C-alpha cells in the first residue's frame, strides 16, 4: 500500500492543474474577421458613458460602452479607449477623468458625439466636479476618478481609475448599446 503525505499530494495536484491551465502558444489562426467578431460581441448589451477630462483646462470627452466596475475596495472602474484616439491621447495627460453614465435623454447626444472631431460639449449642461473634471448635470451617475493604471490590450487601452467622488441621480431610463445602435431600457418591464 502506497502512502502519500498531504504536502506531496497537494504539490502534485497543483502541478497537474498548472499544467492543464497553461494555454497553448498563440499560434492559432483566427477563423473569423473583425466584422464577425464585432457582430458577436455586439449581442451583449452594454451601458453607455461619456468619459471626460480637462487637460490644460479645456474640456474633452469620448463616448464609451466599455465601462466596468473593477473593485469595491478600493472603488475602481475601467474603460477601454482606442489606442488611435487623439481625444484620449489628450485626455490622459490630465491624470483625472469623469465618468458620466448616460440615460435616455442623451441618445441624440451620443449619436452626435461619437464621430471623431465632433464638438462633444455643444448643447450640454455641465459643471466642474470637485476634482476639476467636467460632469454632466443630468447624468444618471457621475464618478470622479484618478488614473491608477493603463495597460495596452490589442488596439485599445485598458484604463483603470480610482473613484474619489461620485453622485447618483434618481433612477431613470439608461442608455444602452446593443447590436450597433443606442437603445433605451424601461424599468419595471420583465
Where are these regions (language model features)?
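Basic, polyanion-binding surface patches
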Residues: 2-190
Amino acid at each position: 500500500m502506497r502512502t502519500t503525505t498531504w504536502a506531496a499530494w497537494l504539490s502534485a495536484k497543483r502541478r497537474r492543474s498548472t499544467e492543464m491551465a497553461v494555454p497553448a502558444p498563440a499560434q492559432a489562426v483566427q477563423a473569423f474577421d473583425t466584422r464577425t467578431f464585432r457582430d458577436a460581441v455586439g449581442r451583449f448589451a452594454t451601458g453607455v458613458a461619456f468619459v471626460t477630462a480637462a487637460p490644460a483646462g479645456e474640456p474633452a470627452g469620448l463616448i464609451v460602452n466599455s465601462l466596468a466596475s473593477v473593485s469595491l475596495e478600493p472603488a475602481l472602474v475601467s474603460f477601454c479607449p482606442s489606442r488611435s484616439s487623439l481625444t484620449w491621447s489628450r485626455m490622459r495627460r490630465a491624470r483625472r477623468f469623469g465618468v458620466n453614465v448616460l440615460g435616455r435623454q442623451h441618445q441624440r447626444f451620443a449619436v452626435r458625439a461619437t464621430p471623431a472631431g465632433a464638438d462633444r460639449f455643444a448643447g450640454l449642461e455641465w459643471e466642474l466636479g470637485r476634482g476639476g473634471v467636467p460632469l454632466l448635470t443630468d447624468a444618471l451617475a457621475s464618478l470622479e476618478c484618478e488614473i491608477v493604471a493603463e495597460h495596452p490590450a490589442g488596439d485599445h487601452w485598458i484604463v483603470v481609475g480610482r473613484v474619489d467622488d461620485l453622485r447618483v441621480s434618481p433612477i431613470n431610463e439608461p442608455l444602452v448599446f446593443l447590436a450597433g445602435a443606442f437603445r433605451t431600457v424601461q424599468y419595471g418591464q420583465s
